[in-house]
Design a protein with these regions (language model features):
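Aromatic-rich carbohydrate-recognition surfaces in CAZymes
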Residues: 257-360, 385-393, 561, 565-568, ...
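Solvent-exposed loop and edge beta-strand segments that line ligand/cofactor-binding
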Residues: 198-208, 247-265, 272, 306-319, ...
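Active-site acid/base region of carbohydrate-active enzymes
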Residues: 215-235, 287, 292-296, 327-387, ...
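Conserved oxyanion/phosphate-binding beta-strand-loop segments in alpha/beta enzyme cores
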Residues: 57, 211-253
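Active/binding-pocket-proximal capping segment
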Residues: 283-290, 518-528, 557-588
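Terminal accessory carbohydrate-recognition/targeting modules of carbohydrate-active enzymes
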Residues: 1-223, 262-263, 273-274, 554-558, ...
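Structural helix-adjacent loops and short alpha-helical linkers that scaffold large soluble proteins
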Residues: 218-230, 271-284, 329-347, 400-422, ...
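Catalytic cores of carbohydrate-active enzymes
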Residues: 297-300, 358-365, 381-385, 391-518, ...
Length: 620
């Protein structure tokens, strides 16, 4: 049992080209050969009275489910992937037959005749134009196949695994050079896997993950201050790596099979904190590739598919995060050539934000800020955003400093860009503070802003994602709602201390140390008063205490930090789903509507833990 680490709820098994979301013994989603795909099938155990315990296999991203009938163990299922190919394998050992219901939105074709007695097989065709998320769709015909050992059987839509040993292999067909070879590659890879030594594949899988864990570079002396530190490092590394695509983009959890800007930055920081520079580099390369392919940056982008997800004001906030990723990788590695080769991308990210400056302020993005979470009204989307403006100033300043240091831009160009940045910086305190109050928005921006007559986003009337028209009042309605309801612009100011912490995490805070400390102490008191969310009936975001802990470590002296260890304990206590974190918590527990096993929350919480432990470590 020492090599088996208990996990709760949903977890992921994946290698960048195939992924499976698993809960107990149930397969709740599986997809290949890329990550911007809908779930192809589910497989759910029919006997509801059986007990299933799930474990991650220490030293790898493999999982085992143990199935019991009362006190009697009746079987084990071990899930793992091929190290690189779009192949997932489930090995099954049972003392009696066990039945699972197979369901799929795509009609599975019986291909038993192709393999004769070598396998029970079902082929899935996912048509070009299938929805991935919202309006984002696949752009290629995709084939996947489920292969079962010949001693399995299928009856009336159920798969029966027999007593003894059996297996399930799920294969995705790579698209090939021209995007048209999925069927041929699915069939050839299926044939190859039926002849493969599955024990050898498992050994290669374990060796692959040992290599990843060996590459992790953290201060283990500092981490020794908490129990099971290695387990934590492994768990978060697995959560990030299994949800990072072969292209470099990262899904935002089981619900969202696209790569989102804000989420990508959190994961990037997690990789950097772990010393895993290669996946961090691939993330930046991926986003640069999206820009060079499209000429703009969508709100979220496909991985292995050209689809994208659009929202309002996609040229702000996320562009600040992307520029920070490029700079932080360059600063950490000293690879100036990496930045030099991507100056077209970097300049685009800078100028996209500059074009949105009004009175020194950048507006909100429609999906990556407080608006998407319902914390701030969407009708105020074109207000000045404190967080987006801070990101612009911080990222632009660092970029222009690098351009001057490494002679990446002419002095005249640097001067022109710097004038805009410094003007925004000079106005920041006036724009977003009033006495001791820090505001997340400033309505004055809209008085001079030239908002578009049409935009794509969320209707202020029916909340549908579609194309919108600006109303005489200044809000936005879809053609169906236009003229039937009003859409006034929200004109109040909002204050919440939580808005400060993301810009602080990104190294872009423009507030004084004293103001930061005052806000921190208010936040600390609130968290302790509601017992770290246990008495909070509303949602608490899953990264809240991690980002607070990170800010505490950044603002306070090491001698003062031990007084805030309760925040560290609260973060560790919140771990679920594979010893990582979920999207939202309510009354101290994961919210029912929360996306589980989240890369963003897990990465930020790990950054907070590492920053705190490094700051309090008294060793060499």
């Amino acid at each position: 049992m020492d090599n088996l680490i208990p996990v709760e709820s949903l977890h992921f098994v994946g290698n960048g080209s195939v992924a499976m979301g698993c809960e107990g013994a149930d397969i709740v989603q599986i997809f290949a050969p890329c990550y911007s795909m809908p779930g192809v099938m589910t497989l759910r155990m029919t006997e509801s009275d059986l007990t299933v315990q799930s474990f991650r296999i220490r030293g790898s991203a493999g999982y085992m489910a143990r199935i019991s009938d009362g006190e009697k163990l009746i079987g084990e299922m071990t899930d793992y992937t091929h190290p690189t190919l779009p192949v997932l394998i489930r090995r099954v050992t049972l003392s009696r037959p066990l039945s699972f219901v197979l369901e799929s939105p795509f009609h599975p074709v019986n291909t038993d005749g192709v393999y004769q007695s070598r396998a029970i097989s079902r082929l899935f065709e996912i048509p070009d134009g299938t929805v991935v998320f919202s309006k984002s769709k696949t752009d290629k015909e995709t084939y996947c196949q489920m292969l079962l050992s010949p001693n399995c059987s299928e009856k009336e839509g159920s798969i029966i695994f027999p007593a003894g040993e059996s297996y399930l292999i799920f294969v995705g067909g790579d698209y090939g050079e021209h995007g048209t070879e999925s069927f041929a590659n699915c069939m050839s890879l299926s044939d190859a896997m039926l002849g493969a030594d599955l024990d050898r594949v498992y050994a290669d899988f374990q060796a692959y993950w040992r290599g990843i864990f060996h590459s992790v570079q953290v201060n283990r002396g500092a981490l020794a201050q908490i129990p099971d530190a290695e387990e934590l490092i492994e768990a978060v590394t697995v959560a990030l790596m299994t949800q990072t695509s072969a292209q470099g983009g990262v899904i935002a959890g089981a619900f969202y099979h696209l790569a989102y800007g804000r989420d990508m930055y959190g994961v990037f920081r997690g990789y950097m904190a772990l010393g895993l520079y290669e996946p961090a580099r691939r993330m930046v390369e991926y986003m640069c590739g999206i820009y060079r392919q499209k000429g703009y940056m969508p709100n979220a982008s496909g991985m292995g598919m050209s689809c994208s997800h659009r929202h309002e004001n996609d040229s702000v906030e996320q562009t600040g995060y992307y520029l920070l990723e490029l700079l932080e990788y360059t600063e950490a590695t000293g690879d100036v050539g990496f930045l030099r080769d991507r100056m077209d991308y970097a300049v685009f990210l800078l100028e996209a934000q500059e074009k949105q400056l009004v009175r020194g302020m950048i507006p909100f993005n429609g999906d990556e800020t407080y608006i998407a979470g319902g914390l701030f009204p969407r009708s105020g989307i074109d207000h000045g955003s404190m967080e987006a403006t801070a990101l612009y100033i911080g990222a632009a300043t660092r970029f222009l400093d690098a351009c001057e240091k490494y002679e990446l831009m002419s002095r005249e160009e640097i001067s022109t860009h710097s004038a805009l940045t410094e003007d925004s910086r000079a106005r920041f305190v006036e724009n977003f503070t009033d006495g001791d109050t820090v505001y997340i928005n400033n309505p004055l921006r809209i008085s001079d802003a030239d908002t578009p007559a049409c935009r794509h986003g969320v209707c202020h009337g029916c909340s549908r994602m579609t194309n919108l028209l600006r109303t005489p009042e200044g809000g936005y309605l879809c053609p169906s709602c236009y003229g039937k309801t009003s859409a006034p612009v929200f004109n109040e100011r909002y204050s919440t201390d939580c808005a400060i912490w993301m810009s602080a995490f990104a190294g872009c805070s423009l507030l004084s140390v004293d103001r930061m400390k005052d806000a921190l102490m208010r936040t600390v008191t609130q968290a302790r008063d509601n017992h770290f969310g246990e008495t909070n009936p509303g949602n608490t975001v899953g990264y809240e205490y991690g980002i607070i802990l990170y800010t505490l470590a950044s603002c306070l002296s090491p001698e003062d930090l031990p007084s805030y260890r309760d925040f560290l304990e609260a973060i560790l206590d919140d771990r679920v789903t594979g010893s990582v974190w979920t999207e939202y918590y309510r009354n101290g527990k994961p919210s029912e509507a929360s996306c589980p096993y989240r890369p963003w929350e897990s990465a930020i919480n790990l950054c907070g833990i590492i920053a705190y432990l490094n700051a309090t470590h008294k060793g060499d």
